[in-house]
Curated annotation (Swiss-Prot):
Biased segments, Polar residues type: 479-492, 520-530
Keywords: Chloroplast, mRNA processing, mRNA splicing, Plastid, Repeat, Ribonucleoprotein, RNA-binding, Transit peptide
Name of protein: CRS2-associated factor 1, chloroplastic
Keyword Transit peptide included in the entry's annotation: yes
Entry-linked SUPFAM superfamilies: YhbY-like (SSF75471)
GO terms of molecular function: mRNA binding
Chain intervals for the UniProt region annotation (Disordered): 68-136, 191-221, 471-532
Transit peptide per record: 1-37
Annotated localization: Plastid, Chloroplast stroma
């Protein structure tokens, strides 16, 4: 076992006279004065840096002397070299060059005269005048104008704000490559052109069908009998004649399930997508474009920009998916060529969307509005990368009820819901109040006008409408006995009975204002039946299965529907089963009091004898096991209400009398039980629900 101590243990005692000189006593020492052996001790020793400096100086002087005494440089170059020069370096810095301007033994050899190590810096060549774009700050944002271009180029043609920028964040330049830039090139140079020129693709001269190694290509067209492709250049001639419904159905159904599509995101239609669409048109007649995010707020603008910038025709659209037809006479060889944007330019500085005091409000009103908006319920929740086709319509409908509208945008990117707010400001129009807590709060403004406006002229109800309410003998509705009995029990009321209002208001039909009817007409016209679901084959075929005649417009259809509604309303007012209030009587208390008074004196309405037939209710009860004699009996009780077909709902227009006869008859008869017929005879098994308590206790014991 070893013992470890912090201090050494003194085994031997130290000497009394220690010798501080380590030399041995037999060493002979000489005096330095006048002694030859002490010469090396008296000289001053030079440092290593001084020695290296002297070596460099001597070598530099020797090199200069050799250059001066060498008259014929060619002869000197022709002389064979005994040994190549190798720099020995210095002891302190072996990798450093001992002589400036000469190679070190650690330096890499020159690759050759054609590739010098230190390339001279070539000044930037001025850009070509023909390709140099002009950067413009216009009302449409930042644009680039190039000579010979069909239109002004932008980074995004659909999502660029329609507001003039205040200033640029950096010096203006075009992002189309080195030939169009006025600043030093900091990126990677483009690859040199291939020596082998590729054959230009001609859509009118397709390769033979079935050739190996070639992708499938659709023929140009479709063409009508006797018509073929033509080399044309204008947009109208490329499109050709309008497509028929059969042609549209065939083109769209062939692209519904394709995965070769163009995805459009928050930046909308960008400049480089122009070439991408032409690449998709190279092999197919129709390009499928799927839009998600901010660009779906205004799909009309997306379709307009596509047809204007690229050409083609949007033949079908459903929600965020649209199909762009290239044209009957489209040729990929004669397509327009667009320069490629090599990077996204920096966005300029735009005015603030949210003002501290919005236009038309005071500071106190704006503060109260923002405080009220925090407690307001949002009309919808916008998801990330969703389809917002109906957002503008929903906001307009919400403004009919409340002056403030709140939209929940939690989870979205900050720039996305700000772009949505800017679009709503122009499309609705409205005033942006706040973007607080990822919520869009908008105000309808002072100059807002309702779509349900009431005219100034007032008169009796349906004064200007002349409708023949007389029914022919064949079309007269048959009156059932129950209906005739109900009608005789409630005779028609005279005008004096209609005026029995507790508040003293007149309830006669003559006091109805025609403005209410026109307001109802406008409200019916404001409804829209647009669907935003993604197209399917069945839905598309259902939309296209219509007669060849020219379809009726939505205005004509709504006009016919409104006329039918007005006829029914006029008949109801004349028969005393309906009442229309004035605009001044739209207070909640007034409406309630008049409704109560009218319900007590109104005549009954028509009785609908044939209501909806109720389905027979079938109740099945699971089988139970009985442990008597190891026998298992499965019984099921089935209760079928046979009188369900006899039940009828009687609805009286004006008093709402509902009589459910089928349910009462079902309660009187009770439920009927029926056992299933067993293949075997189980005599000791009692039917379910017939055992008494004593018998059940005996069985369980």
């Amino acid at each position: 076992m070893s013992l470890k101590l912090n201090t050494p243990f003194p085994i031997f005692a130290p000497s009394l006279f220690p010798n501080h000189n380590p030399r041995a006593p037999s060493e002979i020492r000489f005096s330095r004065w006048g002694n030859a052996n002490a010469e090396r001790f008296e000289q001053r020793r030079r440092s290593q840096e001084e020695l290296e400096a002297e070596i460099r100086r001597d070598r530099r002087f020797d090199a200069a002397t050799k250059i001066v005494h060498t008259h014929d440089s060619e002869a000197a170059a022709a002389e064979p070299k005994t040994s190549p020069f190798r720099s020995r370096g210095t002891p302190s810095l072996p990798s450093a060059r001992s002589i400036p301007g000469r190679r070190s033994k650690y330096s890499k050899p020159d690759s050759g005269p054609n590739r010098p190590k230190n390339k001279p810096r070539v000044p930037d060549s001025p850009p070509q005048l023909d390709a140099k774009p002009e950067v413009k700050l216009s009302e449409d944002g930042l644009t680039y104008v190039i000579n010979g271009a069909p239109f002004e180029f932008k980074y995004s043609y659909t999502e660029t704000p329609k507001v003039k920028p205040l200033k640029l964040r950096e010096p203006a330049y075009a992002p189309f490559g080195p030939t169009t830039m006025g600043r030093p090139w900091t990126g990677r140079a483009p690859l040199p052109q291939s020596q082998k020129t590729p054959r230009e693709f001609d859509s009118f001269r397709l390769p033979p069908v079935g050739k190996k190694g070639l992708k499938p290509v659709q023929k140009p067209g479709p063409f009508r009998p006797g018509v073929g492709p033509r080399y044309v250049y204008s947009k109208e001639e490329i499109l050709g004649e309008p497509l028929t419904k059969e042609e549209v159905r065939e083109l769209v159904t062939s692209c519904l399930k394709t995965t070769r599509q163009l995805n459009m995101g928050r930046d909308g239609l960008t400049h480089n997508m122009l070439n991408n669409i032409h690449d998709l048109w190279k092999r197919r007649r129709v390009c499928k474009i799927k839009c998600k995010g901010v660009c779906t707020v205004d799909m009309d603008n997306v379709c307009e920009q596509l047809e204007e910038k690229i050409g083609g025709k949007v033949i079908y659209r459903r929600g965020g998916v649209l199909f762009l037809f290239r044209g009957r006479n489209y040729n990929h060889r004669t397509r327009p060529r667009f320069p490629l944007m090599l990077w996204k330019p920096v966005a300029p500085v735009y005015p603030r969307l949210i003002q501290q005091v919005p236009e038309g409000l005071t500071r106190q009103e704006a503060t109260n509005m923002r405080r009220k908006g925090r407690e307001l319920m949002p009309i919808c929740k916008l998801g990330k990368n969703g389809v917002y086709c109906d957002l503008v319509k929903n906001v307009k409908e919400a403004f009919e009820v409340c002056e403030l509208v709140r939209i929940d945008c939690q989870g979205m990117k900050g720039s996305d819901f700000r772009k949505i707010g800017a679009k709503l400001k122009d499309l609705v129009p409205c005033v942006l109040v706040s973007f607080e807590n990822e919520q869009i709060l908008i105000w309808r403004g002072r100059e807002w006008k309702s779509s349900l406006t009431t005219p100034d002229k007032k008169g009796d109800i349906l004064e200007d409408i002349e409708v023949d309410t007389a029914l022919p003998e064949d079309d007269e509705p048959s009156v059932s006995p129950n209906q005739s009995q109900t009608m005789t029990q409630n005779p028609p009321l005279d005008s004096m009975e209609l005026q029995n209002d507790p508040d003293g208001h007149d309830l006669s039909p003559s006091t109805v204002d025609s403005s209410e009817m026109e307001g109802t007409i406008n409200s019916l016209q404001s409804w829209s039946t647009k669907d935003v679901t993604e197209p399917t084959v069945d839905s598309f075929l259902r939309d296209l299965e219509e007669p060849e005649d020219e379809p009726e417009t939505s205005e004509e259809i709504s006009k016919q529907s409104i006329e039918r509604v007005l006829i029914l309303m006029k008949q109801a007012v004349e028969s005393g089963t309906a009442l229309v209030l004035d605009a001044a009587d739209l207070d909640a208390d007034t409406v309630f009091s008049k409704a109560v008074a009218f319900s007590s004196v109104a005549s009954p309405g028509p009785v609908f004898q044939h209501g909806l037939r109720k389905q027979p209710t079938v109740k099945k009860q699971e089988s139970q096991e009985f442990g008597y004699g190891d026998l298992e009996a499965k019984s099921s009780n089935v209760v079928v209400s046979r009188n369900a077909s006899k039940s009828s709902n009687v609805v009286v227009f004006g008093k709402r009398e509902v009589a459910e006869r089928g349910e009462r008859e079902e309660k009187e008869e009770g439920s009927k039980k029926k056992m299933d017929e067993f293949a075997e005879d189980y005599r000791e098994v009692m039917p379910h629900g017939t055992l008494k308590v004593d018998e059940l206790a005996k069985l369980l014991a």
